[in-house]
């Protein structure tokens, strides 16, 4: 991993919550210090491009076989599988909205629901460390800054009620790393 930043305290978020957040720039399939990673999947859950394809390739064919048994996933929801050849225990698959021009309020609600669904699924499965990729920003065309703001606000809101999970925002691109740094200063 190239860079790691631990967030500072802000006025609106307690120091305790900020200590549960960090960002990493690098390949999500190589993160070794989390129990689960989040896959920005398509509705079929059968692999695709971007991070979805990378996770499927790194996990091996068993992931695809297990995903077939899940019969897809609705936009804004999440499902869990084993991680197989990945260095974590689980993969949480979530399907973000596809944005045509600029995101609608429904798109924003669905993206927030992706983060909420993953956090709830992690809590239900006693997952204490979770890494999120950037959901919907690649092939699904959600604007990076808006998506990051929704991600950070949703996760901070969840952590204000559930302080028993640590969250990593894993980003691959330098511009996303800068965006997350700006949002959490």
Q: Predicted segment positions?
A:
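Glycine-/small-residue-enriched capping loops at alpha/beta junctions
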Residues: 2-125
């Amino acid at each position: 991993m190239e860079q790691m930043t631990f967030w500072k305290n802000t006025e609106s978020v307690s120091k305790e919550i900020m200590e549960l957040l960090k960002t990493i720039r690098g390949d999500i399939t190589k993160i070794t210090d989390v129990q689960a990673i989040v896959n920005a999947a398509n509705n079929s859950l059968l692999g695709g491009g971007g991070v979805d394809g990378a996770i499927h390739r790194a996990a091996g064919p068993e992931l695809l076989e297990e995903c077939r048994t899940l019969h897809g996933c609705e936009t804004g929801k999440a499902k869990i599988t084993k991680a197989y050849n990945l260095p974590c225990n689980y993969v949480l698959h979530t399907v973000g909205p596809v944005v045509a021009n600029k995101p609608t309020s429904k798109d924003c609600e669905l993206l927030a629901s992706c983060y909420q669904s993953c956090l709830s699924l992690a809590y239900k499965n006693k997952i204490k460390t979770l890494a999120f990729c950037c959901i919907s920003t690649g092939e699904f065309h959600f604007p990076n800054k808006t998506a990051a703001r929704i991600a950070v606000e949703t996760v901070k809101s969840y952590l204000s009620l559930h302080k028993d999970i640590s969250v990593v925002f894993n980003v691959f691109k330098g511009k996303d790393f800068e965006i997350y740094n700006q949002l959490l200063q």
